Structure formats: structure tokens, C-alpha cells
Amino acid sequence: MAAKEIRFSDDARQRMMKGVNTLANAVKATLGPRGRNAVLDKSFGAPTVTKDGVSVAKEIELEDKFENMGAQMLKEVSSQTSDIAGDGTTTATVLAQAILREGMKAVAAGMNPMDLKRGIDKGVSAATKYLADELSKPCETDTSIAQVGSISANSDESVGRIIADAMQKVGKEGVITVEEGSGLENELDVVEGMQFDRGYLSPYFINNQQSMKAELEDAFILLHDKKISNIRDLLPLLENVAKANKPLLIISEDIEGEALATLVVNSIRGIVKVAAVKAPGFGDRRKAMLQDIAVLTGGTVISEEVGLSLEKATLDDLGQAKKVDVSKEETTIVGGAGRHDDIMARVEQIRAQIEESTSEYDKEKLQERVAKLAGGVAVIKVGATSEIEMKEKKARVEDALHATRAAVEEGIVPGGGTALLRAQASLDGLEYANHDQEVGINIVRRAMEEPLRQIVYNAGGDGAVVVNEVRNGEGNYGYNAQSGEYGDLVEMGILDPTKVTRTALQNAASVAALMITTEVMVADLPKDDDAGAGGGMGDMGGMGGMGGMGGMM
């Protein structure tokens, strides 16, 4: 086992603090509407330009082991905040640095770190409660949704508007994804109804030559979880569908040989207008998705597991939809005939699975299923003039989307660092057990001014002057760093999601308090390779040079 280097008390904390400051100073330059960009070198391709705090933090590794430990712990603050709220990573970093800086001073002055931590925890708990109960307002109108999106995308109003449009079209539950577009402008592509990535099994099912799709109006939908290879199983049902004079979409594990050929012939001759596709997904997920389609269309999955067979299936077992489009690669079902209550019950059931799931991949797939049942899918295609700009813009749009979802979930507070300044009121009159805990509470009070100070500093102003001016106002009164004016921030459209502000404060305090209570740090001793090589060759006299050459090869 390699020898270790051990640092104690003040020496350890100072080294850790140096690493924290290095990372925080790099990240906080990006805060606010007038924050600057960071350029990140990549091992291949063009450098990345970003104004996203967590992207900057993730790139930073320091040479000194002890400084690096501090930087890595601070990095955890921004990545945790990003994972939970999707935004607010720079704010969280600024808060953590401020709590740590003030905390280190208190520890150096001889105060008990554990009592400081208890005081910090009390202060944060009171402040987050105040944010949620007193300051937060619901975010329901399209205007406020657009404003939150704009602020998070660095005051880009077009991004805010397109996110608000997407939410309006697919509902708050719908899935909104962000992709790289091919044009210069941002575009919104909305798919209504249920869409899955399986196309027709034979091009002979196409009935619209222009769009190259099989289009079925007012169609029956047969759902089967096994392969269909024998047409005799299907004949009774096909005859009934032909009598009803409606088209039919068959979704099954597969259709092969004679069965597929017979369906194609019937379709070409116009006896039954039919299209067939494979069921989406694999294994258990396939069964679940077939069940989703059944609920959406008011049909039943014909499955031997529940004692149903194809030859005994009737028209009552079939689902119905107003319109079905089947292209080469995907199928869209619009206007399913399922009962609204059944669909909502199914959605709740899937939501319960999301809560229990531990895998991010599973959660994403379950969330997609909710969207397909409850709303639809919207794709925001980001436009830009160059690849570097495209990457930067796409990251901003994704941030804005996360922030908007957070706002819809927990509401909004006035932005620009004002909400945290107002939440200082919650720290007045808090009970504490001793003087050290009181200092802990005051550390939180001082730190809550820091995001506003930093926003003003990045805009070229004097933080202390602005903080005093905003503190003398009340409610939504704050500072607009973009225009340099004071006023009602909600009216100006400067809003932050409550969840983002709350998460930033909680995560910052959690990690900063851990660092304050650190007394010892242990790291591997740096390996001195050169000294080792030189020492080994010392006895070889004239051959030393050769030995050195050997080492070089």
C-alpha cells in the first residue's frame, strides 16, 4: 500500500478552501444575464463554449490532491442541483463558497464546527420553508412559463416562447425533447396522440402514394402479443371487420408468411383496408406498451395468458381510433376511443412505477409512456449557424426546459437573487442553543446575499449598494442586471423556479457544512518518478547515460 500524506485542522481546511475558490471563481463568472462565457478545451473537435455552471465545474481537476478534494466536493453541489432541479448550478456554487468562507473564519476564531453546522442547518430549514410558503406563487400562465424559460436560457426570449408553446400543445405531462435542427431558427415539431417506432411490415399496405404512408380513418385496432403465421386464426375477425366496413390496424409480435401475404392481397383488392405493424418494445416492456395502446383505444390485448385467442376474438375486443398513420419507420394513433378515467388510472399506475424505479433509463422510458397516454410528444429543433453555437444553444434550451418544468411543479419566486435576500427575514427570531449556533445562522444570512452581489459584480456594478437598495424595498422589488434598473421583478418577467432556488440553498449548505466540520485529510503521496529513475542508475557509472536512454524508450 502506498504511503499517505496527512493534513490536519487549519492546514487541511486552507488547502481545501483554495481548491473551492479556484473552482467557484471559474464557475461564478457565468452567473446572471451579464455573466461571461467559459471556453472548455476538448481532446478532439472544437472547444465548447458554455455559460452553464455545471459544465464548467465538471471540467475542473486540480494538480494538488488536497485542493482537488475541495474542488470535487464543491463540484458535487452543482451536479446534485442539476440532477434534481435542472438549473441553479452556478447559484448553488456561489452559495456554497460563501457559507464555507464565513464558516472557515468562525472555525479559525475558535468556534465549535458542529454547533456551526447545527446553526447552518436551522437557518437553511427556515429559509427554504419561507421560500415555499411566503414567496412562491404558482406558475400557470403561458406568459410566466415563457419568462422562466427565457431567464434560464440567458434572457433569450425566443427559447422561452417555444417552450411555452410546446407545453401548451402537449400539456404539462407531455414529453418535450431537444434535438439539433438543420435550419438557422428554432422549430417546434409536435406529435399528437400515441407514436411508436415501428413501421408497416409490407410497403403494399401504403394507400397514400404522396406521403408514402398507410392512412386509416376511423379504424379498428387488433392487439396481439404473439406471432401470427396462420391466416385461419384471423379469418373470422377479418370477415366481421369487412362487414363493418372499417379499416383495421394489426399490432402483434410479428406476422409472417401466408398470413402476411393474405392481408396484403386483401388490402390491394380493397376487400379489407388493413395495415400491420410489429408491437413496440421488447419483453415485459412490449406487454406493458400493448396494454397502454389497449387502454388508449378502448380495446383488449388478445393474449393466451388471460385465456383469449385470435379465433374467438370479436369486434368488442378491438380498440378504435379516429386516425392511424403508418409510415416506413413509425406508427401514430390519434383520437383513441378509450375512456378518460381508464387512461388517467393507467397514467397514475405508471407514475407509481416511476416513483419506485431506481434506474434512470427505466424512469425515462416510463415517463415517455405517461406522455404518450396523457399528452403527446413535442420536439424542439434548435437552429444555429455553426456547430459550436449549436452545442451551446442546445445546452441552454435543455437548461431552460428543466427550469420550466421545475417552475410548473413548485411555483416561481422573484429572480435575480432577490428571493434569497427576502428569505433572510425568516432567520429573525430563530431559537438557538448557544452563541456558536447563532453564528451558524448568521453565516447563512450573509451567504444568501451572495448570488445578488455576484450578479451585480458580473454586470459591472457595486454589489453592496444594490443589496442595500433591494433590502430597503419589499416583496418583488429587486434589481434587473440586464437593464440596470430597479423595480417589480415579476412584472419585468425576471423569475426563478422555487425548486431551483430551494435546491441550490439546501445542497450548498449540506456540502459546505461537511467541509467546515473537516479536521483531517488523507491523500496518496505524489510519486516522484524522475528521482526514482535517477537513483536506480547511480551505481552503474558510465552506463548511467545508457540506462537513462533505456528509460526513454
Swiss-Prot record:
Organism: Alkalilimnicola ehrlichii (strain ATCC BAA-1101 / DSM 17681 / MLHE-1)
Annotated function: Together with its co-chaperonin GroES, plays an essential role in assisting protein folding. The GroEL-GroES system forms a nano-cage that allows encapsulation of the non-native substrate proteins and provides a physical environment optimized to promote and accelerate protein folding.
Binding site for ATP: T30, L31, G32, P33, K51, D87, G88, T89, T90, T91, G416, D496
EC number: 5.6.1.7
InterPro entries reported in the protein's UniProt record: Chaperonin_Cpn60_CS, Cpn60/GroEL, Cpn60/GroEL/TCP-1, GroEL-like_apical_dom_sf, GROEL-like_equatorial_sf, TCP-1-like_intermed_sf
Entry similarity comment: Belongs to the chaperonin (HSP60) family.
Presence of the UniProt keyword Nucleotide-binding in the record: yes
Pfam families the record matches: Cpn60_TCP1
Gene Ontology MF annotations: ATP binding; ATP-dependent protein folding chaperone; isomerase activity; unfolded protein binding
Gene that specifies this protein: groEL
A biological-process GO annotation: protein refolding
Principal location class: cytoplasm
SUPFAM superfamilies listed in its UniProt record: GroEL apical domain-like, GroEL equatorial domain-like, GroEL-intermediate domain like
Catalytic activity: ATP + H2O + a folded polypeptide = ADP + phosphate + an unfolded polypeptide
Highest taxon above the source species: Bacteria
Keyword annotations: ATP-binding, Chaperone, Cytoplasm, Isomerase, Nucleotide-binding
Gene3D superfamilies: GroEL (3.50.7.10), GroEL-like equatorial domain (1.10.560.10), TCP-1-like chaperonin intermediate domain (3.30.260.10)
Enzyme class per UniProt: isomerase
Localisation per UniProt entry: Cytoplasm
Subunit-structure text: Forms a cylinder of 14 subunits composed of two heptameric rings stacked back-to-back. Interacts with the co-chaperonin GroES.
Name of protein: Chaperonin GroEL
GO CC list: cytoplasm
